[in-house]
UniProtKB/Swiss-Prot annotation:
This is Citrate synthase. PROSITE patterns: CITRATE_SYNTHASE. It comes from Rickettsia africae (strain ESF-5). Citrate synthase is found in nearly all cells capable of oxidative metabolism. The lineage of its organism: Bacteria, Pseudomonadati, Pseudomonadota, Alphaproteobacteria, Rickettsiales. GO terms for cellular component: cytoplasm. Pathway: Carbohydrate metabolism; tricarboxylic acid cycle; isocitrate from oxaloacetate: step 1/2. SUPFAM superfamilies: Citrate synthase. Keywords: Transferase, Tricarboxylic acid cycle.
Length: 435
């Protein structure tokens, strides 16, 4: 409860076994304030219980702000819609890492450094050959990114002076590894980066060019992918970002930390949701079957889930989904699919029906960022097993910004959550013949 005797509301009171503890209230620059419970365990001989950390702030951060009730997402104070419409991915990367938008000179230097570091060690090619041809690109990504620590042993004992170069290396090399993982999975030769192309063009070129076929990047496709990368760049302390921070708190090298983020992102409840949306739309098959599947989604005994709706944080329309809905239409119009893409037609009608249904309104289930992104990827010719890989490219920027911020935080400690133990109190060991 709030301390009514404190006019500035700087403390909360917690009563445990008859004893009152005053807990400092930490003021946020915007959004919810936070009660500091860090001394409760030492003074009250008990811990707090918060499964999934849904009510716990694990750190202080200046990078990303989310207001889920109002549908607000901001990076360093800038609205996500403004960044998606007016900026480009590397400018947003600079913003997340350094805290400010770059000047023209800073932007040019940054993009040149990213281009310079886009090549990977030639020996990495041998690692790809150890995977079978049916290997999931995310499995290859996970191994390849982790292996980078073998090629940069100087970063096993990194220093503060290494933070910025490490971030640039990671942002530069991840798209190259992503494209290599795709090429290997389809049996095509690797395509080297082309420093004459910008970041997004370069990735598309590495994905779709071949040694005997030149690939010309469609500007509408490039702009759409640029927006997708911006919209996925960071999202506060989600599962994968928290995983990167936890791994980083132990002093693990940055390549190992990003590998843990990739592993977490691979989960279908996190980075794999847009692929699940595509599978759901295919299962529905036609607009006439939407009411049937709406009913299945409402039936608690039916295993069917309406993918692409609802979010752990947003209780309003996901601002990223609003941008992607329009982007999806732009891409399909450019490709001549706007009026004849069955997945888009099902998605639009499904959204319209769900937003008018009291069941979804009461539960605040609105379309999220995954609802339209998969349709865009599919129209671009990107296979579903690559969807999460593209998420990795974008989110690496956020992971590195969060990793850098964590190491620069003077309050940084190794992460060590506690538990509520509910197992046996004590048991006597018996030999195997006595059991």
């Amino acid at each position: 409860m709030t301390d009514e005797n404190n006019n500035d509301s700087e403390f909360a009171e917690l009563k445990i076994r008859g004893k009152i503890f005053k807990l400092p209230i930490l003021k946020a620059s915007i959004g919810e304030d936070v009660i500091d419970i860090s001394r409760v365990s030492a003074e009250a001989d008990c811990f707090t219980y918060d499964p999934g950390f849904m009510s716990t702030a694990s750190c202080q951060s200046t990078i990303t702000y989310i207001d889920g009730d109002k549908g607000i997402l901001r990076h360093r104070g800038y609205d996500i819609k403004d960044l998606a419409e007016k900026s480009d991915f590397l400018e947003v990367a600079y913003l997340l890492i350094y805290g400010e938008l770059p000047s023209g000179e800073q932007y040019n230097n940054f993009t040149k450094q990213v281009a310079h570091h886009s090549l990977v060690n030639e020996r990495l090619h041998y690692l790809f050959q150890t995977f079978c041809s049916s290997s999931h690109p995310m499995a290859i990504m996970l191994a390849a990114v982790g292996s980078l620590s073998a090629f940069y042993p100087d970063l096993l004992n990194f220093k503060e002076a290494d933070y910025e170069l490490t971030a640039i290396r990671m942002i530069a090399k991840i798209p190259t590894i992503a494209a290599m993982s795709y090429k290997y999975s389809i049996g095509q030769p690797f395509i080297y980066p082309d420093n004459s192309l910008d970041f997004t063009e370069n990735f598309l070129h590495m994905m779709f060019a071949t040694p005997c076929t030149k690939y010309t990047v469609n500007p509408i496709i490039k702009n759409a992918l640029n927006k997708i990368f911006i919209l996925h760049a960071d999202h506060e302390q989600n599962a994968s970002t928290s995983t990167v921070r936890i791994a980083g708190s132990s002093g693990a090298n940055p390549f190992a930390c990003i590998s843990t983020g990739i592993a977490s992102l691979w989960g279908p409840a996190h980075g794999g949701a847009n692929e699940a949306v595509i599978n759901m739309l295919k299962e529905i098959g036609s607009s006439e079957y939407i009411p049937k599947y709406i009913a299945k989604a409402k039936d608690k005994n039916d295993p069917f889930r309406l993918m692409g709706f609802g979010h752990r944080v947003y209780k309003n329309y996901d601002p990223r989904a609003a941008v992607l809905k329009e982007t999806c239409k732009e891409v399909l119009k450019e490709l001549g699919q706007l009026d004849n893409n069955p997945l888009l037609q099902i998605a639009i009608e499904l959204e319209a029906i769900a937003l008018k249904d009291e069941y979804f309104i009461e539960r605040k289930l609105y379309p999220n960022v995954d609802f339209y992104s998969g349709i865009i990827y599919k129209a671009m010719g990107i296979p579903s097993q690559m969807f999460t890989v593209l998420f990795v490219i974008a989110r690496t920027v956020g992971w590195m910004a969060q990793w850098k911020e964590m190491h620069e935080d003077p309050e940084q400690k190794i992460s060590r959550p506690r538990q509520l133990y509910t197992g046996y109190v004590h048991r006597e060991y018996k030999g195997i013949r006595e059991r």
